[in-house]
Amino acid sequence: MSNVNLSVSDFWRVMMRVCWLVRQDSRHQRIRLPHLEAVVIGRGPETKITDKKCSRQQVQLKAECNKGYVKVKQVGVNPTSIDSVVIGKDQEVKLQPGQVLHMVNELYPYIVEFEEEAKNPGLETHRKRKRSGNSDSIERDAAQEAEAGTGLEPGSNSGQCSVPLKKGKDAPIKKESLGHWSQGLKISMQDPKMQVYKDEQVVVIKDKYPKARYHWLVLPWTSISSLKAVAREHLELLKHMHTVGEKVIVDFAGSSKLRFRLGYHAIPSMSHVHLHVISQDFDSPCLKNKKHWNSFNTEYFLESQAVIEMVQEAGRVTVRDGMPELLKLPLRCHECQQLLPSIPQLKEHLRKHWTQ
C-alpha cells in the first residue's frame, strides 16, 4: 500500500511552464504572464514608468508558454519595439527569449524568461529554479548576445553574423542545471563547439552578433547576475577574467595591429556577468544601430580595469543612474570625435582610420 501511495504522489507532481516579463535594469519585480491570458501593461506603479509618452495601456502581452514565446500587441500611440524594430499601432508580433522589448521610444527594456514549476494539487507551487529575495539576482539568461552560437571569423565581411567556431581546449566544467531551452548563454558556455578557451574559473566564447572583427565574451562559471551583484569576494575572479581576455587577444589576434578594449556593459543584456573583449575597428555587419555603437563608445561601456579598481577600493561596482540615455547620444567617431548622421556614414568614415 505504501508503494502505491508513493507512486500516486509522484504521479500527481507535474511540471508546468510559466512565463515572466523582466525589466533589464531591475527597476521593479518581474511580472508573471499567465498562459494564454491577455495582460495589458504600460505607465503605472507596476512598471514604475512615469513617462507620459508611455500609455497606461501601451502593450498587450499573451504568453504561449507551451511554445516558448509571447505575443506582443502595441496598443499605445507611441512606438513599442522589439530589437529596435517598431511593432506598429494595433500590430502584433512574437517576442522570443533572446529578444529585447522596449516599451516606448527605445526606452524601458524588457525580456521574457520561461521557468519550469513543480506543482502539487492543493499545495504551494515550488519553483524548479531558485531566486533570492534581491531582484538584482533574478536570472535572465535569454539575450541576443548570448544565444547558442558564435560570431564572425576575424576579418570576415560577410553579411552573415554567425559561423561555426573552433573547438576549445579541454578542462573540467562546473556542472549547472541548464533549465529551459531559452537559456542560450548557459548552453553556449557548456558546449565545446562554442568555446575558444576554458579553465576552472572561466570560459570564452565568440559573440554570436560580433560588433567588430574580433569580439569575445569572457564568462565566469560562477553565476553572477549583474555588476550590481559583484562584491569584494569576486575581485580575484575579475582579475582572472581580464588576464584571460588579454591572453585570448594574444592567442587569436596576436598578428593584428588592431587596438582592443576590455569592459562591461553598465546594464548587461543577460543576467550573467560577462567581459567584452572587442577590437576597435567595429567592422561588422552586426553593428546596425545607434544603440549598438553607443553601448561600446560611451560611458555605458565600463573599462575592465576601472571595474577592478572600484571593487578593490569600495567592494562593489557603482553604476550611475541614467545609463540607458547614453544609448541615444549622437553618433560620434571614437577615434577623432567627428559627429556622423547615420551608421552607414559612420562605417564609411571608420575606414579612413583603418589605414592610419
From Swiss-Prot:
This is Aprataxin. InterPro entries: FHA_2, FHA_APTX, Histidine_triad_CS, HIT-like, HIT-like_sf, SMAD_FHA_dom_sf, Znf-C2HE, Znf_C2H2_type. The histidine triad, also called HIT motif, forms part of the binding loop for the alpha-phosphate of purine mononucleotide. It catalyses: a 5'-end adenosine-5'-diphospho-5'-2'-deoxyribonucleoside-DNA + H2O = a 5'-end 5'-phospho-2'-deoxyribonucleoside-DNA + AMP + 2 H(+); a 5'-end adenosine-5'-diphospho-5'-ribonucleoside-2'-deoxyribonucleotide-DNA + H2O = a 5'-end 5'-phospho-ribonucleoside-2'-deoxyribonucleotide-DNA + AMP + 2 H(+); a 3'-end 2'-deoxyribonucleotide-3'-diphospho-5'-guanosine-DNA + H2O = a 3'-end 2'-deoxyribonucleotide 3'-phosphate-DNA + GMP + 2 H(+). Changing residue 281 to G: In AOA; heterozygous. Widely expressed; detected in liver, kidney and lymph node (at protein level). Isoform 1 is highly expressed in the cerebral cortex and cerebellum, compared to isoform 2 (at protein level). Widely expressed; detected throughout the brain, in liver, kidney, skeletal muscle, fibroblasts, lymphocytes and pancreas. SUPFAM superfamilies: HIT-like (SSF54197), SMAD/FHA domain (SSF49879). Residues 122-167 are annotated as: Disordered. GO terms for cellular component: chromatin; cytoplasm; nucleolus; nucleoplasm; nucleus. Residues 1-110 are annotated as: Interactions with ADPRT/PARP1 and NCL. A zinc finger (C2H2-type) spans 331-353. It comes from the Eukaryota. Its main location: nucleus. It is found in: Nucleus, Nucleoplasm; Nucleus, Nucleolus. A motif (Nuclear localization signal) lies at residues 126-131. It comes from Homo sapiens (Human). The lineage of its organism: Eukaryota, Metazoa, Chordata, Craniata, Vertebrata. A motif (Histidine triad motif) lies at residues 272-276. The modification Phosphoserine is found at residues 132, 137. DNA-binding protein involved in single-strand DNA break repair, double-strand DNA break repair and base excision repair. Resolves abortive DNA ligation intermediates formed either at base excision sites, or when DNA ligases attempt to repair non-ligatable breaks induced by reactive oxygen species. Catalyzes the release of adenylate groups covalently linked to 5'-phosphate termini, resulting in the production of 5'-phosphate termini that can be efficiently rejoined. Its EC number is 3.6.1.71, 3.6.1.72. Keywords: Cytoplasm, Disease variant, DNA damage, DNA repair, DNA-binding, Hydrolase, Metal-binding, Neurodegeneration, Nucleus, Phosphoprotein, Zinc, Zinc-finger. Interacts with single-strand break repair proteins XRCC1, XRCC4, ADPRT/PARP1 and p53/TP53. Interacts with NCL. Interacts (via FHA-like domain) with MDC1 (phosphorylated). The record marks 188, 265, 276, 291 as: Interaction with DNA substrate. It is linked to Ataxia-oculomotor apraxia syndrome: An autosomal recessive syndrome characterized by early-onset cerebellar ataxia, oculomotor apraxia, early areflexia and late peripheral neuropathy. GO terms for molecular function: chromatin binding; damaged DNA binding; DNA 5'-adenosine monophosphate hydrolase activity; DNA-3'-diphospho-5'-guanosine diphosphatase; double-stranded DNA binding; double-stranded RNA binding; mismatched DNA binding; phosphoglycolate phosphatase activity. One of its GO terms (biological process) is regulation of protein stability. Residues 182-287 form the HIT domain.
